[in-house]
Structure formats: C-alpha cells, structure tokens
C-alpha cells in the first residue's frame, strides 16, 4: 500500500451540496473533538443546529453515507489482495429510550430483549502487509421489531436463508467484492459465527477466498471421525511461540503452539437444504497450545481455521494464521466506536435513523484513531504519517516534539521523522504515556486522549499559521 493520504469527504454524495459540506464538517468536528455528542463536538450553536437538522433530514440518507465509506475504501486500495474482516456488534440505547420512544421504527430489541438499540455488521478492509485499515467495503445496519416472534414461533429451521439475520455473513462478502477494484482479491475473515455451511458453499469465487474459524465439530465425508478428531490425529508440522495478552479469564504468557494442517471434505449437515452440495472440499489449519504453557484452570489457545487458500506448506499455513490474527482489529474498531473512543452509545439523538447516520459519519474518525494505535504497534517506519495526517498537522507535530521529548536518549522519539510510528509516539506521549520502550504499550484510551490533545493544540497552531500568512501578505515588500 502506497498512497499520499487517506483523505475522506462527502463531495458529490448528496443532491444538495450543502449536505455534502455539512457532513464533511461534522466528521471533522467528531475527529477533532473525539466524541460524537453533538453538543460537545460542534464548536458553535449554529453548527450544532445544522448537525441536528442534517441528521434528521431525509435527504441525508444512510445509503449515501454508506456509499461515501465504500468509495473512500475503494480509492485507498492499491494492492492486489486485501483482508476483509466481518463481524457484528450492537449499539445499546436503552438509557435513551424515553427520548427516542419505543414506537421509533429505527430502534428495537437487541441481544437482551428488554434493551433497545440496533445492530451493525461492517466489513473492515485491512492491508495484508502493513496491517493498516483501509476502510469499510460493506456494511449492514438493522434493528429488530418489538413484536418479532421467537425462533420456534417463526419456524426458524424452515425459513429461507435470505430471510434470516445470519444471511449477513453471505450478503456482505458479495457486496464487498462489488466495491473493490476489479483486479483485487479479497480474503473474507470471520469468527465462529461465520461458520455456516451455506456460506462456505456460496461465498468463494475467483476473487474471494475464505478464512473462517470453525465452530462446529463437523462430520467429514467418507470418514468415520469428526473434524476435531481428524485434525488432532495429524502429525505436528511446526511449533512456534506467541505472546498472549492477559485479561479477566486468561493469564499473560508466552504460549507454545503446535501447527497441523490438511485438506478434507465436509459433509452437508442434516439441517442444510439438499439443494446444497453433499460434500465440500476445503483446507483446515489446526493450531493448539501445547500443555506445558497452559496455566492451571485455563483452556488452551485453540483455532480450527477453514480456508479456500492453498495450504501445502508450513509457510502457507503460518501466513493464513497471521492473517486470521488480524480479525482482532474489528473488535478494536468496535471498542473505539464505543467506550474506549467516541462513545457512540452516549449520543443523545431522538431517532434510531439519526443515530445510524451519526454512526456512519463517525466510522472514518474511529478508523483514524485505530490506525494511529496500529501504526505504533507495527513500528514500521516505511509507513508515512501522511497517510493519516496532513502536511500542516505534521508541521505541528514537529514543533510539539520539543514539549514531550526528554533530555535522555530513552525519552527521544526513536522513529524516523514523518513516519507513522513517529507520529503515533507523539500522540501517545500527549495522551499520558510514559515514553519508555520498557513501559506498557499505549492503549486505545491513551491514543484517543492523545489525539484529543493534539487536535486541540493543532487548532491553535493552524490559527497562528493562518494569522502569520495574513501578516506576511500585508507586509511591505
């Protein structure tokens, strides 16, 4: 991926040029303020009124805002292969239901039936080499009806696939391919919820590969064993170590992983219509943590990855494993949109439609925060800061380094000037990170706080820069 910048705007997306300008301005306000709350992100009363009116204007439609996302993603792709990561999240507005009202057609029950909100299923496009986000190539927003019947009442097993919510796992890859450059191949990555036999049959084509984590211990065609038994019986092809970050139910550690892989044939489940093929040939990569590094009381790290990519060598298998590890990025995107970033669930609008449109405008801002964090983590100095920051912003960064660098080498920015890790180091320091390489890596809250601080300082820098330009123009020659 090599491009001068990943700029985003809404030029030409709406019939009314004023909506183009207003949407671009609101995105800028969200990016600069680090929040989607209109009363906090818009600097003046006039801007706030304009934002509310736009979000409630039927001419500012979800389809045009989505198309702007897809157009930007298309323009950012310069490689022949991209990773397309899909997953689902929900936005909970139960705290605001009195303002919105249960009769609003844009809001409905979410996972917890008594809570109100809507669902979002995006396709995040990631460059397979730099591991940086390029944009969103497909997206589905929807809400359930309050009077929707349960699975038993609806006869879920007999409902056509196209009418099920799970059809999103098939629908979005097709829409994603349509939005990509014609010579670009996509690898669809999904967690266990995407392990649907119909999807495994329908999605692959000349430009679409699959890399799905298996959820079912499936039956195999022509064999007396199930998938897990078959993969466990194979000889270990390689062993390697990975660093595991701890959380509530998992300890931090260096895990030793065993790698196995094989081609196999999945048998059609009895719940799948007979119109689908009886057996499906696919490759499986099985990675499991060896017993010696599994802490007592914990389950081992274990992935069974189903893929249409060729897996004949350890190198090919490891490449697929590393691609699948990028699936975590979409979880991080959801966190940036919510409590660790833009606080989308605190937005105080009066309709589900307006909230969905606000989410579509907030996505590019979330991607920028995410890219800065990943830019620091990658430490890849070949990635230019100019991908995500303007020349003026980079000049401001150069000046701000004097305020955050220490006197010792350990507190100097170690990265090449104007590289993305160089910019991310500054942002992290402005967010309160200690700056030492031995310190814990800055997280999203630190990066988001640093972006807020930087953009506040940049506003002053830009104002002074413009003022000096005016003085220079007026100065006698």
Give the location of each predicted region:
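Single, function-defining residue in the core of a domain
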Residues: 1-104, 112-119, 124-477
């Amino acid at each position: 991926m090599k491009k001068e910048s990943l700029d985003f705007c809404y030029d030409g997306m709406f019939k009314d040029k004023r909506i183009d300008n207003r949407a671009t301005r609101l995105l800028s306000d969200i990016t600069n303020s680090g929040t989607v709350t209109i009363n906090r992100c818009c600097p003046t009363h006039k801007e706030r009124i304009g934002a509310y009116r736009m979000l409630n204007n039927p001419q500012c439609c979800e389809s045009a805002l989505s198309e702007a996302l897809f157009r930007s993603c298309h323009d950012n792709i310069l490689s022949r292969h991209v990773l397309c990561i899909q997953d689902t999240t929900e936005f909970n507005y139960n705290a605001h239901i009195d303002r919105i009202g249960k009769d609003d057609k844009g809001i409905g029950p979410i996972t917890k039936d008594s809570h109100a909100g809507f669902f979002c299923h995006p396709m995040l496009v990631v460059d397979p080499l730099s591991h940086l986000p390029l944009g969103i190539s497909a997206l589905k927003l929807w809400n359930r009806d309050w009077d929707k019947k349960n699975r038993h009442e609806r006869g879920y097993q007999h409902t056509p696939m196209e009418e099920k919510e799970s059809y999103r796992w098939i629908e979005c890859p097709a829409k994603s391919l349509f939005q990509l450059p014609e010579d670009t191949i996509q690898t669809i990555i999904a967690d266990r919820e995407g392990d649907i036999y119909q999807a495994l049959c329908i999605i692959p084509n000349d430009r679409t590969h699959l890399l799905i984590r298996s959820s079912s211990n499936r039956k195999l065609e022509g064999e007396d064993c199930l998938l897990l038994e078959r993969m466990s019986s194979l000889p270990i092809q390689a062993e390697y170590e990975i660093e595991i970050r701890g959380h509530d139910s998992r300890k931090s550690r260096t895990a030793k992983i065993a790698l196995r892989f094989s081609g196999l044939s999945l048998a059609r489940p009895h719940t799948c219509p007979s119109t689908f093929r009886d057996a499906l040939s696919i490759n499986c990569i099985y990675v499991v943590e060896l017993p010696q590094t599994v802490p007592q009381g914990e389950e081992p790290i274990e992935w069974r990855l189903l893929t249409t990519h060729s897996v004949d060598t350890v190198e090919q298998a490891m490449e697929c494993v590393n691609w699948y590890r990028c699936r975590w990025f979409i979880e991080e995107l959801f966190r940036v949109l919510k409590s660790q970033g833009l606080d989308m669930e605190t937005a105080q609008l009066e309709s589900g439609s307006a909230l969905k449109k606000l989410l579509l405008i907030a996505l590019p801002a979330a991607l920028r925060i995410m890219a800065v964090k990943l830019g620091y983590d990658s430490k890849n100095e070949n990635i230019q800061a100019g991908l995500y920051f303007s020349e003026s912003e980079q000049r401001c960064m150069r000046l701000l380094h004097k305020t955050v660098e220490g006197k010792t080498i350990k507190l100097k920015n170690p990265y090449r000037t104007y590289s993305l890790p160089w910019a991310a180091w500054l942002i992290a320091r402005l967010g309160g990170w200690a700056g030492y390489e031995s310190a814990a890596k800055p997280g999203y809250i630190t990066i988001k706080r640093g972006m807020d601080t930087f953009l506040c300082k940049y506003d002053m820098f830009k104002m002074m820069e413009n003022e000096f330009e005016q003085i220079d123009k007026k100065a006698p020659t």
